[in-house]
Amino acid sequence: EKLDWMNGHYLRRMDVDKLADCLYQYWSDYPPEELDRIPSIDETKEIVILIQDRIKTLKDAAPFIAFLFKDKIVYTATQLIQKGLDLEDTKNILNQAVSLLNNIDDFWEDNIEESLRTFAKENNIKLGHFLGSVRFAITAQDASPQLFKSIEILGKDLTLFRLDQAIQTLNS
């Protein structure tokens, strides 16, 4: 435990580019089974900022970002429905998210965050319900690295595809 803490402390203080290089080399030498493909060095540099404060070892990184490098994510309709919501609430939230994200021309973190937060606030939707539903639909995880940056990295097309996939799952 002490060694994990020390290693985590070292990784958190490491230069982002150096950590990205270490991760890229580690994944190249020991491909994680969680990833359908190994991220490029440029992709690795982009995701390091999402996970640097969460990992204790290089091996810890892949589970946090697996959703970014999976061809398909799998879940059931029951898993998509957040606590405190029902089927219709979840469908409405995901449909609204599709509409909001589809209308963002400059698809980057700040615009994504502003659009989703503003909509939830103006429509008196609990932010946790709204963002939790979106998070699970695109990551198949209850917790993930920074949601808005993750959406930016996934890209508009893949994000919208995953939201549509979640809506189809709820409709079946």
Annotate each predicted stretch with a short phrase.
Residues 110-170:
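Charged substrate- and nucleic-acid-binding regions of tRNA-handling and nucleotidyl-transfer enzymes
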Residues 1-4, 17, 45, 49, ...:
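Non-catalytic, well-ordered alpha-helical scaffold segments
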Residues 1-28, 32, 150-157, 161-172:
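Non-catalytic terminal extensions that flank enzyme cores
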